[in-house]
Amino acid sequence: MCNFACAYCPEYLHDGKVGFPKYDDALWFVKELSKDKPDLFFEILGGETTLWPKMISFVNEAVNINDNIVIEINTNGSRTRNWWKRFAESNVQKNVVLNFSYHAAFCDPDLYYDNLFTVAEAGYTVASNFMLDPPYFDKVVDLWKRTHNLPIGASIKLLRPGFDSHKLIDGYTQEMLDYIVKTNMDDRHAIEGDANWDINVFADEEPINWQERVIEKKHSFKFWYCSAGSKRFHVNLFGDIRPCSQLTSYINDGIPHEEDKRYLLGNIFKRDFRPYEDLIVCPVDYCPCKIDAICYKHD
């Protein structure tokens, strides 16, 4: 469920047909992961995650279950100023990182900036992704520059149609692509806050420019060994637990094709979970999701 309807996002994220997980099922999954993975990174994606009425309660209860958990909440930052003040006052700075994304076609830039300011001032670890929709280039860049006075990480991001693995949306000029690469090479990756959260991508122990890799289509790890499924898990809208975002299925009302079932690790609604015991060989052509990319892998 989402309150935006961005043209580049899949329709199922904002068509209103899929709601939120049951509170107890979500907590069950945190408990299961915490049994043998005490240092846990838990990413919450949408739709718009902060529309979940149980969000603040869930975060606080998850921290009670596992004091070492780090929860990343992905949000478009569009809730009211009062909502974000209430969230900031929950005092979970050690355990929560906030990953904002600015979508210029729908989001009020002043509201977005004010909400960034609120959580950053409260000491939360905050990153802001400025989604570069070509018709809004100037609007996006202006707000990105405006946030440079805030203690946050800020970067301009490429957009892919419907989360395609390697294509970019139409409308990018070479000047825009060069600007994205250049701004992702600066020092804006330094993110302040109490939570331990490193989202830089490394290759052979050297940091790389991930946006540049995607533009140049150098983001393939096919046939590499990967810890997805043993250390990294992705839960789709229908509760299916899978190794990563590329090995998931949203088709057919959540019923996977026969060939997809081999990558099914369980379902949180059925309270069934069977992680892999070792690395898998990557079967996909491209790995566009940054969180999938930072998952340990080798050739």
Regions from the PLM with identified roles:
Residues 1, 5, 225, 281:
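The −1 position to Zn-ligating cysteines in a subset of zinc-ribbon hairpins
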Residues 1-25, 244-245:
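Canonical Radical SAM [4Fe-4S] cluster-binding loop centered on the CxxxCxxC motif
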Residues 1-12, 39-44, 231-235, 239:
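N-terminal pre-triad scaffold of radical SAM enzymes
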Residues 8, 228, 284:
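Short, cysteine/histidine-rich loop/knuckle motifs that typically chelate Zn2+
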Residues 47:
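Active-site flanking residues adjacent to catalytic metal/cofactor-binding acidic residues
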